[in-house]
């Protein structure tokens, strides 16, 4: 395959990653609504450690465990941001 062929393949993979990240975020929205309803805290460090350990175990390379951890730390950070927005919006709606 040529460089352009590989780039097209990467482009398609990137599109799939975006789809999956948005699908994951939809789940996060639902979790945020449930946490708001039952009064659960936004930040749950034990759960985040569990997620990070799971993705590190699932990694078969060529990315290093450290690289996977950094990527998922960022994903989890964005997930908290989404949850925070959902929980805040739900609280705002309840106060109206």
Language model features with spans:
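Domain-level signature for soluble enzymes in the chorismate/prephenate branch of the shikimate pathway
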Residues: 1-96
